[in-house]
Amino acid sequence: MTLFAEAVSVHPRLIVELGVRGGESTFAFERAARLSGAHVLSVDLEDCQVQSSYPKWTFVKQNDITFAGEFPEWCASHQLSPEIDVLFIDTSHLYEHTLEELRFWMPYLAARSKVILHDTNMKRVYRRADRSLGMGWDNDRGVIRALEETLGTKFNEAQDFVTVADGWLVRHWAHCNGLTVLERL
């Protein structure tokens, strides 16, 4: 429900989803897109093109960093402005890769946009909102560390927080491997 609500709140025209896997986030973004007539662009290394039947959904099977360089041309070929209203990042969870994603994709963000990052609090064992436990893996703070470097600050990802950093409202939920939402101020 959080992904849907965050996306709907900006009345998006273009939602970019980096990392599809089983399509859970695609499902939420597709429903948000239907309300505003937005296009959803999903990028993944694996073939995930059966995840949606939404007519304005496009799947690209490619490395998301490589595709970022082709994004303006892709937008032109689809009669879209290369301005992202919602950027969702849920890919490798590795520091260097996430840092590159932020560097390559953030310049395409619209004036009023959101960036949503999943797995910003990865541990070997994690706690869900219902207090049950799940098994994860320690990614050496990959996603949150890349975000810290991008915004020039430090975060305690083990705790929920709301703060302002480098022109962004930053909201973070620590449970279930962490979810962090940036909203441009």
For the regions a protein language model found, what residue spans apply to each?
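S-adenosylmethionine/decaboxylated-SAM
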Residues: 1-185
